[in-house]
Amino acid sequence: MSDRYTYRVTWSAEDEEHVGLCLEFPSLSWLAPVPEEAFSGIREVVREALVDMLANNETPPQPLADRAYSGKFVVRIPPETHRDLVIRAAENGVSLNRLVSSLLAD
């Protein structure tokens, strides 16, 4: 199951090593001198955490990839930004929703 989670490897200037991260387990990380070792290290740490959670009857987090998404979310912005976006959408002959969707996709 640990292969279904969302992993990232990035450089840690503070540690001067690559750090492996798992988005669903934000408290876990693994440092290594090369990216491949950081990736395999964090996957092993997550695997061990899952084994431990299941042994203690804890529910592991649902992988981001397995979650259902509605395609809708609410964003609060300043009224001036809202106005500017409406004007920009009108100038482009598209709906506000289409404009914002396009901007977010970039």
Feature locations, PLM:
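A short, exposed loop/beta-hairpin motif centered on an aromatic-Gly-Thr core
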Residues: 25-37
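Short, charged, surface-exposed hinge/linker loops at domain edges
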Residues: 1-6, 43-106
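N-terminal segment of the canonical double-stranded RNA-binding domain
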Residues: 1-21, 25
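Short acidic, gly/pro-rich beta-turn/loop elements at beta-sheet edges
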Residues: 17-19, 30-32, 85
